[in-house]
Amino acid sequence: MQDFHFPTWVNKFTVLVILTGLTVGGYLATCLFAAIHPSIVNVGHQPRQPVPFSHKLHAGQLGLDCRYCHNTVEVAGHAAIPATATCGNCHGGNMTTATEPGKPGRDLGVIQPTSTLLQPVRDSLETWDPVVWTKVHALPDFVYFNHSVHINKGVSCVSCHGRIDEMEVVEQKEPLSMKWCLDCHRNPTPYIRDPEMVTNLAFQPENPEQYHKEWAEKLGVKPDTSCSVCHR
């Protein structure tokens, strides 16, 4: 019987298959790297802002509630960047309107009235042109996220934003990736607390497992994991 031999063109085909496999494998590896590497998903993103607003000072040392500035977070999908008038409550006045030197006046705030760092705030109050802040936490394209739903279901600001009250300059602490969101939706209980405590970033319950379980049951937390929840 005559021996069978593959035609010579098979050699080229074999090389083509190997090259295709390497190309596809490299592409998939690159996609995986892009999906999980902190530098790609913006973990640590810490842009400079037109006004060096310190959350460590305002939310930490002074104890301002998150909702004083982000006042739509309980009723709207977006947390909202505060209007300059909110800054003006403390920083928009001048010394002539103060009831006591160096302290806020009755109608206009005069805290740090001559600080050059706050000049963009004073300019904005005078011209009505908004201060152009740089976004820190940017979701991927075509993703829907509703702040009010999460806040009212007992998810604390700290779960997504970290200890903002300890940040001199705000930075992104979590990847905000699909996997990260799904991990919580599949097992939300450890992140659920009394809605009255969502802005208390330092809060630690005495018996975490029991506490979170009780509040998850009380609030009826059963998040969906279907695609349409986030992609609408």
Where are these regions (language model features)?
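Membrane-embedded segments
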Residues: 65-132
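Membrane-interface loops
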Residues: 135-137
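The canonical Cys-X-X-Cys-His
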Residues: 63-72, 84-94, 157-163, 181-187, ...
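Residues that flank catalytic or metal-binding motifs in active/ligand-binding sites
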Residues: 49, 83-86, 139-141, 180, ...
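A broadly conserved sequence feature marking short terminus-proximal activation segments
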Residues: 21-57, 110-133, 143-152, 187-203
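N-terminal export/targeting leaders of redox proteins
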Residues: 1-52, 56-60, 64, 68, ...
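Soluble extracytoplasmic domains of inner/organellar membrane proteins
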Residues: 139-141, 146-191
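Copper-binding active sites and cupredoxin-like electron-transfer domains
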Residues: 174-178, 182, 187-200, 205-232
